[in-house]
């Protein structure tokens, strides 16, 4: 069967995967969005269905007033003796922690913290022992992939933290994962930074503590020299073996807006690449160490992709998410409408505005909804495409003493520009946002209010590690949204 990359589109970076009872489970980073750490299930590694989130209670994760790209990132999921563990970093508090569950479809535990610094933590289980690793500095100040043994029940360290590998020489060593395959310990990591120089490297040893020998052909996977090619930034991966005994790596990567336009705004997505072990015991990935647009995988199934999203066919506790620590009393959500009671907090604030959103999953998109606004002068409500509090485009109804206007606001680098406005004879309007690789066109009814370039919502310009979110928003009044549809062409 031929599948096409990415296997999960939109801002779902830092994938980690494990298998249990014939199913595969994957988690991704969520940063400042809540609930945290989206959780997916698959039976074939290609079709992924979101089954919930790992961090669903504010007590599990503190996200109050954190900047964009802060919060929770680089999770790892593992299963040991039927219990699932998710370990991650909360950059807000500079702490590594894990949670667990015995029911993958249920709630997860309160966080258990580990007294080892660094970021991108991972777990490895063997013979009743648990090893915790991250990239940082060990107890002697030596930097690299750092490992200690822990008590999995309490998180307490049972050994000193020791640097076990310093990488192959690339900058920003991160994303360590340890595997035991055919009696050999393989340590996989990412280097080069999560941009165009991103890569996956590996080392191996005869002991869990090393000494680890780097693969002489490192990196084992990178698209840094694959040009002109739309898929770039491949790195931060996790190995998984399928039911046929074949190995694969799930990694992040991104799609440029065009092969000659080095900007990406959809965020880092999930790519699946085959892995082969050679007679020398080293593994290679993809096409001579690169990730391509399509591959063949064993299995009798069809690659499916949801192309239309409505209130009725999405779940408020799955596809949708909020910003930081939402005030849930401000939301009334049902199968046919959403009512948002706006506060004084706006999208420009490093706070929790009344805002609910989904990831933008592809370049060609059309999002539409009828918006009805109630409130006094200064109330606003409408649709937005947002990557940070400083970079977002908003088509809004705005209340004034003289009535309602439809306004188009472009926010670029913290500079606010009112591109256009249109008086409305009432308190409701139908808004549409049409997107392609290069820009967003904004409509009130049949009238185009303006246009915003995708370039300014890209990671290269806006900076950070997230991707564009398509959302509903209200401030200083109440906005009712009906007839919502987000369609990918």
Spans of model-derived segments:
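Carbohydrate-active catalytic/glycan-binding domains of CAZyme proteins
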Residues: 1-489
